[in-house]
């Protein structure tokens, strides 16, 4: 039947030039019952209206596998997906896939090349179908184990370059601790940025897992005492994490437990920590790209997608934080007394202006025109192509740059593959400012540092500064060497003449 075929071409968002109509379709006649056809029709129509062409191609492969599964002997009496609970369906699907020689795990490669494993696409697709068809959860959002931030009745303080949509409490294994944590997170969301709250939730998951293994009788935060905390802090300090991560974890755990203590009147929690529990922060090594490294990176960056290449080059030329670059507005360019200026909205603080070169102004103007031609009027210059009302996402850029580095095997001066640290471009910019012999106040102003003492890091990394500061010592060492060579005979005289 014609209406049992759902064509991609019937949906404007799935139009793909050069694709034959018959190649882009879902065939509902593959399903054994009318009830199953209607159930899958609802989900497929939803996906076709909201998904991308590439995602739907992947969906179709998974759908075809599931259609074969539903026609197998084990399902011969099944009329509807509602005839079994979701976990039973998933268990049976996994068994069928193994029988058919279809892998039930998917290898996932991170942007850094590390490999992890998760459920195969077919299983994830079936989970989504079952969830879509399941009963609507009518509980208040804060009663659920996964919160949709858009459904909370508070304004979320977030950085628009990061796509945070949910908070997941499912891996806090003790039900009472999970509920206590929800109350604390809800309170902290009203005063803290979402990134800070995410850190608190992360350490609570780690703490919960530790309690489950080592103190399985503990069911509530009211039962946590100093001995339990000390044992956990020892466990945390012996894990393969950095000192700075441990320090942040302890601070986040303290904040979360003290909030729980205040809400539930668990007085013990408010006095559980002592100052020495927080490990001293180890200052991270201040690194900067060499000129050769910058040349190698930029040679490949300029071959990437034109708007991403512009974004990264503008980021380097401005010396801003990546969040400031990605949230630049189309009206950011101005001229004052013949000088091109740019207005920058800082996510963390305020907005400010700084002078820029004519070349940078032209590059910005090209970026603005590109976005206007492709997406019309937008709030940001660099936009998320799927959601143009939002800025380009940090992880999207990171993934594309790291993929390029892996593909090109692009290495630094030490023979190691480049990482992706947008702050390194900022360091390079700062070092170049010091080599122009600008004063600390001007450098701090151009980099929008609040304190002048931050400038010392850039000065220490400057090759010019190192050359100036070590010239006298190097000359003294040379004199000593020459004095020694002078005693060894005429054959070494040539060394001094060549110097």
What are these language model-derived features?
Residues 196, 333, 388, 392-411, ...:
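Acidic, low-complexity interaction regions
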Residues 308, 318, 398-441:
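Short, basic (Lys/Arg/His-rich) helix/loop patches that form interaction surfaces
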Residues 324-326, 430, 437-449:
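Active-site-proximal segment of tyrosine recombinases
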Residues 358-416:
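Active-site/catalytic core of tyrosine-dependent DNA strand-transfer enzymes
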């Amino acid at each position: 039947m014609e209406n049992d075929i759902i064509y991609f071409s019937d949906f404007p968002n799935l139009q793909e030039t050069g694709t034959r109509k018959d190649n882009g379709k879902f065939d509902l006649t593959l399903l054994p019952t009318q009830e199953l056809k209607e159930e899958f029709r609802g989900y497929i129509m939803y996906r076709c209206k909201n998904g991308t062409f590439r995602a739907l191609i992947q969906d179709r492969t998974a759908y075809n596998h599931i259609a074969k599964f539903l026609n197998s002997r084990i399902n011969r009496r099944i009329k509807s997906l509602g005839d079994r609970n979701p976990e039973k369906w998933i268990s049976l699907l996994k068994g069928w896939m193994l029988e058919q020689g279809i892998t039930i795990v998917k290898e996932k490669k991170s942007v850094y090349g590390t490999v992890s494993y998760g459920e195969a696409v077919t299983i994830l697709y079936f989970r989504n179908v079952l969830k879509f068809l399941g009963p609507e959860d009518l509980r208040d959002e804060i009663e659920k184990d996964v919160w949709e931030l858009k459904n909370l009745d508070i304004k979320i303080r977030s950085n628009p370059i990061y796509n945070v949509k949910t908070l997941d409490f499912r891996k806090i294994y003790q039900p009472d601790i999970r509920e206590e944590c929800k109350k604390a997170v809800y309170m902290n969301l009203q005063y803290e940025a979402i990134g800070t709250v995410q850190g608190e939730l992360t350490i609570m998951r780690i703490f919960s897992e530790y309690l489950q293994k080592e103190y399985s009788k503990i069911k509530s935060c009211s039962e946590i005492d100093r001995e339990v905390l000390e044992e956990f802090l020892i466990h945390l300090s012996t894990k393969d994490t950095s000192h700075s991560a441990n320090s942040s974890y302890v601070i986040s755990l303290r904040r979360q437990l003290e909030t729980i203590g205040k809400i539930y009147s668990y007085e013990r929690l408010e006095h559980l920590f002592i100052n020495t529990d927080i490990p001293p922060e180890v200052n991270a090594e201040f690194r900067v790209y060499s000129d050769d490294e910058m040349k190698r990176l930029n040679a490949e960056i300029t071959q990437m997608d034109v708007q991403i290449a512009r974004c990264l080059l503008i980021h380097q030329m401005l010396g801003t934080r990546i969040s400031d670059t990605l949230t630049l507005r189309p009206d950011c360019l101005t001229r004052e007394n013949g000088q091109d200026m740019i207005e920058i909205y800082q996510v963390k603080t305020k907005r400010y202006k700084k002078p820029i070169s004519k070349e940078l102004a032209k590059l910005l103007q090209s970026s603005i025109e590109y976005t206007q031609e492709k997406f019309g009027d937008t709030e940001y210059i660099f936009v998320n192509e799927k959601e143009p009302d939002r800025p380009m996402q940090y992880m999207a850029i990171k993934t594309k740059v790291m993929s390029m580095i892996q593909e090109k095997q692009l290495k630094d001066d030490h023979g190691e593959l480049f990482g992706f640290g947008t702050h390194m471009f900022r360091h390079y910019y700062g070092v170049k400012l010091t080599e122009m012999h600008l004063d600390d106040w001007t450098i701090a102003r151009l980099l929008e540092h609040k304190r002048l003492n931050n400038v010392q890091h850039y000065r220490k990394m400057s090759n010019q500064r190192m050359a100036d500061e070590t010239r006298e010592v190097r000359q003294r060492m040379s004199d000593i060497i020459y004095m020694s060579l002078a005693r060894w005979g005429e054959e070494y005289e040539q060394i001094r003449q060549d110097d």
